Amino acid sequence: MTGDRAAGDRAAADRTVAERAADRTVAERAAAMRASLESLGLGYENPRPGAFLVKLEGQHKLATMTWLVVGEHSLGVEAFFCRQPDENHEAFYRFLLERNGRMYGVHFTLDETGDVYLTGRLPLSSVSLDDIDRLLGCVLSYSDENFDAALELGFGSAIRREWAWRVKRGESLANLQAFARFADPEAGA
């Protein structure tokens, strides 16, 4: 692709979602979001009009499935972070709440069962391609960077039991290595 064409494609994709969906039909708003996601090179599913499921791949939390829902006036974002903690509830929730004040675009929330999500809402009139890129980058960063510490706080006993069970049976510990510092009895020796 030539530089002029790439710049033109970028400029066209950078128009706000609202501008590209001026008559505000669900189909046109969805088409604007589809164009934005494709411009960013992101794979997605579009299971219903205006709803896009994007898989964000991380290092600690291997996949963060993120919903982008184009509404009449706003773009909603929701990503599952983890289920409700088994233990140490106060420290677990304090850890997440302390992060909320430093976060852009999304924040940690709970559903009615206590499961934890990253959620946010932005006005469609101001959502550009760069905003979508930044918002998804934030979801990935917040999910990935906080995952191990949250699991240690809320699921430490279960992780230790799983570690011991795998060691006893000679099973792989590969996906538990992030927790070796506290789960491996020999690490403290």
What are these model-derived regions, one by one?
Residues 1-5, 22-88:
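N-terminal catalytic cores of peptidoglycan-degrading enzymes
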Residues 78-119:
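Short, internal acidic amphipathic alpha-helical interface segments
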Residues 58, 111-137:
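Amphipathic, soluble alpha/beta structural segments
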Residues 36, 40, 95-103, 135-149:
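Conserved short hydrophobic interaction patches
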Residues 53, 108-121, 160-165:
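A short beta-strand-loop-alpha-helix capping motif that often carries His-Thr
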Residues 125-165:
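A contiguous, mid-protein "functional segment" used to position or interact
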Residues 151-189:
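Short, highly charged C-terminal tails/helix-capping segments
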